[in-house]
């Protein structure tokens, strides 16, 4: 998605060979118009897949997921990373290991909002080692729902998350695929469009 | 806002005289079309106020704030409740006391995304005791920005948050004002429309 790649080039800050900071339009400040375009793009790629629900994770997945849900006309459920007083019943949970924080944490979705009739599109802001995506996949499967695919705003293709998900048979649609952050520069995977 | 009130009546769960659970469309599952209508309503109420930025707080404020930002054509910044590795520089912080959790926590916004040239609309999902709103007000003022008003999706009018903010001179626009949750029933404040 060219508009996203240009935004990353213009505003992304390469903090290290591993870390790209996009706090000006996705992870802290949000560009609503770009989120709408991202939502339209995900909706277009999954338009014929019979999606009934989008599952994402707080906080940075919410904006792209809601814009996708608006376009597809389906609800969005966001997994919680932190305990909520009113989120208590019928919890589906998964452990997610954070390589950056080096901590294991629980994510949770109420089973009330996912059923075995659902065909789910999982959306997240970043895909790196794939821990959050695997956690969301686990939760969706616990509900007995099926998975149409995984939509990622920014993929760090030099980390193993994508390949592992693809090997497991999941369709991964990433709107910007980063080949490398070396030498302080963002290089994208060259994709051949059919 | 009648569509929101009907949704609360149909899907809200009164957990006690103090707590209303709206996990089916706002706090856990999100109804994107309703969020768009909420965004349109906030945008309409603040259309002539010269808003340059929207400030909200993760996670449930994000969806209504982004829809409002989309309509007004301005960026959204969400305050973080939890430490982020990439959010480090130039932090504006405030302490927020949670009556429900009985804990004090820090919220933070990077000063990079707020300036003394900004005229801010603060948006949040709930207004009860007003602690989160006061925290956001403090952060916006630390940046030297001015505040156009505070947009609230659901106000618990029987708690003191609104009155305190109005006494301090802030304009509070709440789309659904709840008079009482007694006897397991949602009663709205009767408003006279001019």
Curated annotation (Swiss-Prot), chains A, B:
SUPFAM superfamilies given in the database record: PRTase-like
Subcellular location: Cytoplasm
Biological processes annotated in GO: purine ribonucleoside salvage; xanthine metabolic process; XMP salvage
Pfam family, one: Pribosyltran
Induction comment from the UniProt entry of this chain: Repressed during growth on purines as a nitrogen source.
Keyword Metal-binding in record: no
pH dependence: Optimum pH is 6-9.
SS bond list: none
Gene Ontology MF terms in the entry: xanthine phosphoribosyltransferase activity
Binding site for 5-phospho-alpha-D-ribose 1-diphosphate: 128-132
GO cellular component: cytoplasm
InterPro entries: PRibTrfase_dom, PRTase-like, Pur/Pyrimidine_PRTase, Xanthine_PRibTrfase
Chief subcellular location: cytoplasm
Binding site for xanthine: 20, 27, 156
Pathway: Purine metabolism; XMP biosynthesis via salvage pathway; XMP from xanthine: step 1/1
Known EC number: 2.4.2.22
Keyword set, alphabetical order: Cytoplasm, Glycosyltransferase, Purine salvage, Transferase
Described function: Converts the preformed base xanthine, a product of nucleic acid breakdown, to xanthosine 5'-monophosphate (XMP), so that it can be reused for RNA or DNA synthesis.
Family stated for the protein in its record: Belongs to the purine/pyrimidine phosphoribosyltransferase family. Xpt subfamily.
NCBIfam families xrefs: PRK09219.1, XPRTase
Subunit structure: Homodimer.
Extra remark: Highly specific for xanthine, with a strong discrimination against hypoxanthine and guanine as substrates.
Name of this protein: Xanthine phosphoribosyltransferase
């Amino acid at each position: 998605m060219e508009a996203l790649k240009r935004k990353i080039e213009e505003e992304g800050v390469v903090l290290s060979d591993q870390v790209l900071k996009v706090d000006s339009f996705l992870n802290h400040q949000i560009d609503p118009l770009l989120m709408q375009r991202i939502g339209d793009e995900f909706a277009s790629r999954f338009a014929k897949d019979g999606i009934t629900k989008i599952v994402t994770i707080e906080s940075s997945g919410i904006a792209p997921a809601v814009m996708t849900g608006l376009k597809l006309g389906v609800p969005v459920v966001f997994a919680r990373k932190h305990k909520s007083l009113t989120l208590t019943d019928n919890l589906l949970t998964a452990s997610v290991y954070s390589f950056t924080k080096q901590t294991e944490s629980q994510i949770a979705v109420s089973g009330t909002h996912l059923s075995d009739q659902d065909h789910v599109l999982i959306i997240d802001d970043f895909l790196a080692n794939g821990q959050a995506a695997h956690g969301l996949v686990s939760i969706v499967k616990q509900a007995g729902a099926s998975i149409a695919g995984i939509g990622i705003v920014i993929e760090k293709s030099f980390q193993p998350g994508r390949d592992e998900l693809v090997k497991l048979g999941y369709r991964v649609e990433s709107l910007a695929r980063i080949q490398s952050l070396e030498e302080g520069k963002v290089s994208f995977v060259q994709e051949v469009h059919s």
